[in-house]
Swiss-Prot record:
Protein name per UniProt: Glutamate--tRNA ligase 1
Gene behind the chain: gltX1
UniProt similarity note: Belongs to the class-I aminoacyl-tRNA synthetase family. Glutamate--tRNA ligase type 1 subfamily.
GO CC aspect terms: cytosol
High-level lineage: Bacteria, Pseudomonadati, Pseudomonadota, Gammaproteobacteria, Methylococcales
GO BP field: glutamyl-tRNA aminoacylation
Length: 466
């Protein structure tokens, strides 16, 4: 069996978000050779910095490509904006075959025609007004400098059929499509034209993309057939929706890969979440890319919308944090956090992070609670601490002095001296020492708080501190 070649072909007009990151992931998992192509024909919006960002995002996710550009400098092999001569050759071939023609209709004329068709209950498609202009009329209009698009001629009796690897048999009637634009009036190629040409010339054998591109497929298949170019297999994956059922957007939870990285998500967490958005894996464990690739089956891709839930992402983040090696976890922390953690408590602090934190900012908060004097108690937390009374804290100071290194002995001494137990013991103690009512085990906190700092925090709730 020949190698399956897939591709990811983003437009560098912004940052990569979850939807196109999942497309890239499924494309990488669903083939033997993964190609990156830059579709930058929108010259006004395409930016070199977005190319650099998307390459950085893909590499961070572990999705390196076997073929494609290695830098943001435009390369005619992989950047569509540099392949105009190639597309021009195929435009000429279509015109010579009589399968494409110039259209001089203005945007206003097309809009009027569209409204008339909609008003009469018909689906809007091109009327064919310029389809049979005499050659001398076409020449005259060109000489007058009239702008023209180039349209592909679609026979009304043409039927396009193909087997979608996700959605099954597909059938489109030519009369429902109409003659469509393959080159804009400014000379730039239409998306589905250069997209199809490049897929053929680059040997792409499987195209995985969002279901919103399904309607482009019959157009591309007609173009490829007209030019005797090979056609790939198509797999149109479900779209991602937010928790409100609407397409995922900034409004309902979408974030860029760059934003997730800056928030401290591990790439393994993002990849595992994306891999299960619309695809089933038997394993519920955090899987590496080799295991995800081994378990990927295009027949397991669902047709229903894939619902994004940030709690699922955070679940995978928790597994990634808990499974991270010490050195990885240490360098995941903010530089400022590492600076305040004493070497003697590094291993213990990392153990605390694994059990209690999802993000570096949370770890930073605990580092400052444990290793600095930056503790401030909110009014409700202070009220819990104060409710225990002065005698409780005097007893705690005595117990800590007696058992500075043994939390179990400290706790037994505090119980004996104060008579407190259960929540009346643990809640005020936690509130006074950490400024919180939940968090890491008190035994870990007791071991990491240096004893002068611990004594000062307990003394804050005695009359001696006033």
């Amino acid at each position: 069996m020949s190698a399956i070649k897939t591709r990811f072909a983003p437009s560098p007009t912004g940052l990569i978000h979850l939807g196109n990151a999942r497309t890239a992931l499924f494309s990488a998992l669903g083939g033997d050779v993964f190609v990156l192509r830059i579709e930058d024909t929108d010259l006004e919006r395409s930016r070199a910095e977005f190319v650099a960002e998307l390459m950085n995002d893909l590499r961070w996710l572990g999705l390196d490509w076997q073929e494609g550009p290695r830098g943001a400098e435009p390369d005619p092999d992989w950047y569509q904006s540099r392949r105009g001569e190639i597309y021009a050759t195929y435009y000429r071939l279509l015109e010579e075959k009589g399968l494409a023609y110039p259209c001089f209709c203005t945007p206003l004329e097309l809009e009027v025609s569209r409204k008339v068709q909609l008003g009469s209950g018909r689906p809007p498609r091109y009327s064919g007004r310029c389809a049979h202009l005499p050659a001398d009329e076409v020449r005259r209009r060109h000489e007058e400098g009239l702008a023209a698009t180039l349209r592909f001629r679609v026979p009304k009796d043409r039927v396009v059929e193909f087997e979608d690897e996700v959605r099954g048999p597909q059938r489109f009637a030519g009369e429902d499509i109409g003659d469509f634009i393959i080159r804009r009036a400014d000379g730039s190629p239409a998306f589905f034209f250069c997209n199809a040409i490049d897929d053929a010339l680059m040997g792409i054998t499987r195209v995985l993309r969002g279901e919103d591109h399904l309607a482009n497929t019959p157009r591309q298949l007609m173009i490829l057939a007209a030019l005797d170019l090979p056609r790939p297999r198509y797999a149109h994956i479900s779209l991602i929706v937010g928790d409100d059922g609407a397409p995922l957007s900034k409004r309902n939870g979408s974030r860029s890969i760059k934003q997730l990285r800056e928030e401290g998500y591990f790439p393994e967490a993002v990849v595992n979440m994306l891999a299960r958005l619309g695809h089933h894996y038997d394993s519920a464990e955090l899987l590496g890319l080799p295991a995800l690739r081994a378990g990927f089956d295009i027949r397991r891709l669902g047709r229903s919308p894939a619902r994004f839930d940030v709690s699922h992402l955070d679940h995978w983040q928790g597994l990634a944090v808990r499974g991270a090696a010490d050195d990885t976890l240490w360098h995941w922390l903010h530089t400022e956090t590492r600076a305040v953690v004493p070497d003697a408590h590094r291993a213990g602090f990392l153990d605390l992070v694994r059990s209690n934190c999802l993000f570096p900012k949370e770890a930073d908060a605990w580092a400052r609670i444990l290793f600095t004097d930056e503790l401030e108690l909110a009014a409700d937390i202070a009220a819990v601490a104060q409710a225990a009374g002065e005698a409780f804290y005097l007893a705690a100071i005595d117990a800590a002095t007696e058992s500075p290194d043994d939390f179990a002995a400290f706790l037994a001494g505090l119980k004996r001296r104060s008579g407190a137990k259960g929540k009346h013991l643990f809640l005020p103690l936690r509130a006074a020492l950490t400024g919180s009512l939940d968090g890491p085990e008190l035994a870990k906190i007791y071991q990491m708080l240096d004893k002068p700092r611990l004594h000062r925090r307990l003394a804050e709730f005695t009359y001696e501190s006033e």
